[in-house]
Amino acid sequence: MGRIVAIDYGEKRTGFAISDPLKMIVSSFVTVLSRKAVMYLKNCTENYDIELFVLGEPRQMDYTPSENMPRVEKFKRNLRRVIPSIDVQMVDERFTSVLAHRIMIEGGVKKIKRQDKGLVDRLSAAILLQTYLEFLRK
């Protein structure tokens, strides 16, 4: 059984989360510079049995595309070109950053650590993946 990788793509940084092979457990994985994200994922496919990429779809509250949508769509095209054997599913990413901050506050994470944008990106990717896996179980 393959793993699923969630991608929280941003203008500067991209956060990743990965499932276990049984798709039961989500782990916050790593944050990389966005310009290196596709090649990082290509390397991951050599070390992990990845069956699907779940990419956060940036939308406004009224479901219209956010200003990051063109960058995300370009990233998706590039990802499909470089790794054509793995499908890319778009998933609504609204509220993932808000939830990431809330989880850190409720978890007692100190303010200085909550300002680590890479941590927020990884946690947002983990929330995205957890939401996707819960959807699959329904």
UniProtKB/Swiss-Prot annotation:
EC code: 3.1.-.-
InterPro entries: RNaseH-like_sf, YqgF, YqgF/RNaseH-like_dom, YqgF/RNaseH-like_dom_sf
Primary location class: cytoplasm
CDD domains: YqgF
Record SUPFAM superfamilies: Ribonuclease H-like
GO cellular component, as recorded: cytosol
Recorded GO MF terms: nuclease activity
Subcellular location: Cytoplasm
GO biological process, one term: rRNA 5'-end processing
Keywords: Cytoplasm, Hydrolase, Nuclease, Ribosome biogenesis
Listed Pfam families: RuvX (PF03652)
Enzyme kind, highest EC tier: hydrolase
PANTHER family given in the database record: POLYNUCLEOTIDYL TRANSFERASE, RIBONUCLEASE H-LIKE SUPERFAMILY PROTEIN
Family: Belongs to the YqgF nuclease family.
Function noted in UniProt: Could be a nuclease involved in processing of the 5'-end of pre-16S rRNA.
UniProt cross-references to NCBIfam families, sorted A to Z: RNAse_H_YqgF
Name by which UniProt lists this protein: Putative pre-16S rRNA nuclease
Biological source species: Azobacteroides pseudotrichonymphae genomovar. CFP2
